[in-house]
């Protein structure tokens, strides 16, 4: 059995993520999806909690026709030691044989740790980017809904994610600066 690794923040999950995961599953038997930065939430870059991201990702994958029995979702908090990062990640995961990433820095860390790295399948990178989707939400551009599965949009509505983002950007959501 070949198990692949796919790391992301999924803030929020979008169709590009779903399509990448489907493409990865065409090459491996199972995929471990790491929800990185698991400890961060309610900040502009990471507005959703890890629980909300798990929920959105599972529902978005289900809507996209992904067999969830082949998917393992694992939240992993960040550490501030890049040399120890791979060991940290591995301590949370079952064994994997290959990793998929489009991030050159992450690829370097994985390769230095002896992991086979493959290019992450990328679908219309200019369009399907979580940063862009969050910016659209903040600006009131409702076409962000076209970029995410309907189930993800419903969850964002349910948790009042757009309203949350608009409050976060006021600067009042920075307790570390109080």
UniProtKB/Swiss-Prot annotation:
<dbReference type="GO" id="GO:0000309">
    <property type="term" value="F:nicotinamide-nucleotide adenylyltransferase activity"/>
</dbReference>
<keyword id="KW-0808">Transferase</keyword>
<dbReference type="Pfam" id="PF01467">
    <property type="entry name" value="CTP_transf_like"/>
</dbReference>
<dbReference type="InterPro" id="IPR006418">
    <property type="entry name" value="NMN_Atrans_arc"/>
</dbReference>
<keyword id="KW-0662">Pyridine nucleotide biosynthesis</keyword>
<keyword id="KW-0067">ATP-binding</keyword>
<keyword id="KW-0548">Nucleotidyltransferase</keyword>
<dbReference type="GO" id="GO:0005737">
    <property type="term" value="C:cytoplasm"/>
</dbReference>
<comment type="similarity">
    <text>Belongs to the archaeal NMN adenylyltransferase family.</text>
</comment>
<dbReference type="InterPro" id="IPR004821">
    <property type="entry name" value="Cyt_trans-like"/>
</dbReference>
<dbReference type="InterPro" id="IPR014729">
    <property type="entry name" value="Rossmann-like_a/b/a_fold"/>
</dbReference>
<keyword id="KW-0520">NAD</keyword>
<keyword id="KW-0963">Cytoplasm</keyword>
<protein>
    <recommendedName>
        <fullName>Nicotinamide-nucleotide adenylyltransferase</fullName>
        <ecNumber>2.7.7.1</ecNumber>
    </recommendedName>
</protein>
<keyword id="KW-0547">Nucleotide-binding</keyword>
<comment type="pathway">
    <text>Cofactor biosynthesis; NAD(+) biosynthesis; NAD(+) from nicotinamide D-ribonucleotide: step 1/1.</text>
</comment>
<dbReference type="GO" id="GO:0009435">
    <property type="term" value="P:NAD biosynthetic process"/>
</dbReference>
<dbReference type="GO" id="GO:0005524">
    <property type="term" value="F:ATP binding"/>
</dbReference>
